[in-house]
Structure formats: C-alpha cells, structure tokens
Design a protein with these regions (language model features):
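Basic, Lys/Arg-rich alpha-helical nucleic-acid-recognition elements, primarily the DNA-binding modules
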Residues: 1-80
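Flexible, charged surface loops at secondary-structure boundaries
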Residues: 127-133, 177-178, 196-197, 266-272
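N-terminal accessory interaction module
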Residues: 253-336
Length: 336
C-alpha cells in the first residue's frame, strides 16, 4: 500500500494521529476505541481528542451499540469533496475581489520590514505582546517560549487573551509554568513561528538554509489577513487543545475565528455568552451588546457568529465580512 498517499491528507488540516485513525477506519471498517488504538498505534490518552476532531471535521461518525461506541469513516469523496468545493468558491471570490479592488486603486507599498537575528526578532515579539490591547495569537518553539514566558504570563494576568500553539519540542513541565488563563494548543509537527497582535501587527519568524534567523514584520492590513488565514489553517486547526477558553469567563477579542473558537468552548460547557463589541457596518462604526446565540464555521470561507441584541439579530464576520451584516473590530466576551 502506498503509505505516502495518506500523508496528503495533511493539506486538509489533519494531524498525523488523525490520519492514522481515519486510515484505520477506512481500511478496516467500523471499530470501537480499543480496536482503533490497537490497529492505528495512537496513544490511548489522545484517542477521544482525536475522535472529537475527526467528527467535527466530518471525517468520521459514531453510533452507540449496547455499551460500546462504534466509529466509522465517512467515505473519502463524501468527506472531502465539500471542502474542495468551498475552497474553490473562496478562491473564485477572492480573485474577483482582488481584480475589482485593484482596478481603480493607486498602488501602495506594503509596510513590511525584515528583522535579522534572533535577538531582534524576540525584542519585536516582546513589543507586540506588551503593546496588545485585546489579544495575542502566536505559535512558538520551546526556546522562544522560554524567553517569552514571563511576558506572556504578565499579559494574561492583565486580561489580554493569549492563544498559543506549541510544538512537540515543548514538554509538559514548561506548559505547566504558563498562566492557566492562556489558551494552549499543541501541534504534532513543527511549523512556522507566527505572532499576530490585535489583528493589526504581525511577525513571521523564519530560518534559512544557513540557519541564520530572520523575521518579517507586518503592519499592512491585507498581509495580516493572509498571515491570519495561514495561521488558522496550517497551525491552529490541525492542533489539539491542552487548555481551552473556559479557564476565564471574560475574553478580549479582535479576530472573528478566535471569537468562534471561544464561543464554541463556552457553549460546550453549557455556558451563556454575551458580548460588548465594536463593529463596522458599512462605512459606520457602532458599539453593540447582546448574546451570541450561534456560530457558523465553513473552513476556508467564513467564521460567523450571531449577536442577538435589542435591535435584532445580526451576523458578524472578520475582515472581509462578505456574508455578514457587520465586521468585528474588537470587543469583550463574557460567559456564565
């Protein structure tokens, strides 16, 4: 059997463990959790996280037979064809928008800076973290996490939402030193280090073939949008939670997909979520409060949440907000 063909599922956001489980169920048919662990070789403590992720992604289904829960794979074409259709629709829409927006606009030089050497990259990361007013979204390897640990803990105590993705080089002892209010996920494989603060400034930390570190610093809105998209699909989505949003009942936010993740965490625990938001509706900015009644997520296309206020129910999205009534600028979530 050509093993490499299954690794191609990584492009759909599956981790290596998720691929092993999905492959096992595709090849061997429906099984209970004990048999899946035995046949796939995944660690027992991770099994239910992986099942939940695969169910959420529409790749497996479960049913109760007696006292046992049985899992089965959704056929490949059924499970993945809608992702391909949605991505093609998104690309068509994006291409159309780019052509329309650039038709009559003057060319601007993007605000992009090259940062050379690890020390300067860390200094700029520290600046962005301490200057944040609402949220910091980032992925870090062990070495830089150790350097930024104190600052991240301080900002979490200050009420800034910190959403962190770690990699396999980070052990439980280091994770245990993080403030419990920090949202932590772990990715099975190493990826780029990214930092986005308040959805307005960002850093991409890279390493070239000669192992000389360099970083790219952005303040250009369109490039931040692309970096955010890359972070969600390549780093955040394939990762699993260690600590979710529910350790704190109040979260500052400025990113639509992070808001949807937080609301999902709260509602999974049976909590009611209210919000005080600054929104952009057309050319006007408005303050609105209400209850977030629902979220709607189509990976690669939209992250929408619905705010029920005295004036009615409105849909809220991210930067483009092409399917929603309003665009999120910033705000605070409260859950109870």
């Amino acid at each position: 059997m050509p093993e490499d063909i299954f690794q191609g599922l990584e492009m759909f956001g599956l981790s290596s463990y998720e691929i092993k489980v999905y492959k096992t169920l595709l090849i061997k048919g429906p099984q209970n959790s004990t048999d899946i662990v035995k046949n796939s070789g995944i660690p027992q403590p991770r099994v239910y996280d992986i099942f939940n992720n695969l169910v959420r992604k529409g790749l497996i289904e479960s049913s109760q037979i007696g006292k046992k829960k049985i899992f089965r794979a959704v056929p490949v074409k059924n499970a993945l064809s809608h992702h391909i259709t949605e991505m093609n629709a998104f690309l068509d829409e994006l291409d159309k928008v780019v052509r329309e927006e650039t038709k009559n606009s003057s060319v601007k030089t993007p605000y992009i800076w090259l940062i050379e050497n690890s020390e300067k990259i860390l200094e700029r990361m520290k600046e962005l973290i301490t200057e944040a007013k609402y949220e910091v979204i980032l992925s870090l390897r062990k070495e830089n996490l150790e350097e930024l640990l104190k600052i991240l803990n301080n900002e979490a105590r200050r009420g800034i939402t910190i959403a962190l993705v770690t990699f396999p080089d980070t052990g439980e002892d280091l994770i245990a030193r993080l403030n419990p209010n920090i949202v932590i996920k772990k990715r099975d494989g190493i990826a780029s280090e990214v930092l986005i603060a308040d959805r307005s400034k960002g850093i991409l930390n890279a390493e070239n073939s000669s192992k000389t570190n360099y970083g790219l610093y952005f303040e250009e809105d369109e490039i931040i949008h692309i970096l955010n998209y890359y972070f969600y699909h390549t780093i955040w989505w394939p990762s699993f939670y260690i600590t979710d949003f529910t350790n704190s009942n109040s979260r500052k936010i400025s990113t639509a997909w992070l808001t949807c993740e937080a609301v999902s965490s709260y509602k999974t625990k049976g909590m009611r979520v209210t919000a005080k938001l600054r929104l952009k509706m057309g050319d006007e900015e408005k303050d609105m409060t209400g209850e977030i009644s629902q979220i709607s997520v189509v990976p690669g296309l939209r992250h929408t949440f619905y705010l029920k206020s005295r004036s009615g129910r409105i849909s809220v999205g991210g930067k483009t907000a092409r399917f929603e009534n309003a665009r999120l600028l910033y705000g605070v979530l409260n859950a109870k």
